[in-house]
Design a protein with these regions (language model features):
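Short, cationic-aromatic polyanion-contact patches
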Residues: 5-8, 22, 27, 61-78
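Pre-recognition alpha-helix immediately N-terminal to the DNA-recognition helix
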Residues: 10-17
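Helix-turn-helix DNA-binding helix
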Residues: 11, 42-43
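Alpha-helical DNA-recognition elements
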Residues: 17, 48-49
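A short alpha-helical element within helix-turn-helix/winged-helix DNA-binding domains
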Residues: 26-34
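Short, basic interhelical loop/turn and adjoining N-cap
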Residues: 36-42
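Glycine-centered, phosphate/nucleic-acid-interacting loop/turn motifs that mediate DNA/RNA or nucleotide
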Residues: 54
Length: 78
């Protein structure tokens, strides 16, 4: 499992918990609101990093398309 920054781990945990609770993925706006961010640009950066590390996938043309690749995402924060 790739190393994650503390914030990446928090975002991944939030997405995972949201999907488990609601049976659908959060929007970028919902992620931003949860973390107190005024812009979704930062969320996009974190999501892209998680995608690059192979932990999530998303269809860039569809809303709420985030999917967890590995349900067991225990990793070391750096």
């Amino acid at each position: 499992m790739p190393n994650l920054t503390k914030k990446q781990k928090e975002v991944l945990d939030f997405i995972t918990q949201f999907i488990q609770t609601n049976s659908y993925a959060p929007s970028y706006r919902e992620i931003a609101e949860y973390f107190g961010l005024s812009s979704t640009a930062t969320v996009h950066e974190h999501v892209r990093s998680l995608e690059d590390k192979g932990l999530i996938t998303s269809s860039h043309n569809a809303a709420r398309s985030l999917e967890i690749v590995h349900q067991e995402h225990f990793s070391k924060s750096i």
